[in-house]
Amino acid sequence: MTTKLERRIKIKYRVRNKISGTTERPRMSVFRSNKQIYVQVIDDLSGRTLAAASSLGMEAMPKKEQAAKVGELIAKKAQEAGITTVVFDRNGYLYHGRIKEVADAARNGGLKF
């Protein structure tokens, strides 16, 4: 029997082998810890992070609201960098809760998945 972490890592590597970010369509990777949420827009061909946002230093609010704010922030930063379309990498997490909030807020902010 595998633990939740082992399951997530197995899914993460399986998906990572199938998707890759390019300069025209970079990968938007989400990492979720118990207290914070981090999002990066990554060009895998050059190995560079094009935009990043996190909930570090934000005012105290419920985690889902924090995730939505981070989604709006990454959409704004990505558009400033000239990025309109991304490949969404949920990093092995279920598409539910905070991960879904980040994705929905980024879509509402103007990013296309």
From Swiss-Prot:
Keywords: Ribonucleoprotein, Ribosomal protein, RNA-binding, rRNA-binding. The keyword Kinase does not apply. InterPro entries: Ribosomal_uL18_bac-type, Ribosomal_uL18_bac/euk. One of its GO terms (cellular component) is cytosolic large ribosomal subunit. Pfam families: Ribosomal_L18p (PF00861). GO terms for molecular function: 5S rRNA binding; structural constituent of ribosome. It comes from the Bacteria. Coiled coil: none annotated. PANTHER family: 39S RIBOSOMAL PROTEIN L18, MITOCHONDRIAL, LARGE RIBOSOMAL SUBUNIT PROTEIN UL18M. HAMAP family: Ribosomal_uL18_B. Part of the 50S ribosomal subunit; part of the 5S rRNA/L5/L18/L25 subcomplex. Contacts the 5S and 23S rRNAs. This is one of the proteins that bind and probably mediate the attachment of the 5S RNA into the large ribosomal subunit, where it forms part of the central protuberance. Belongs to the universal ribosomal protein uL18 family. This is Large ribosomal subunit protein uL18.
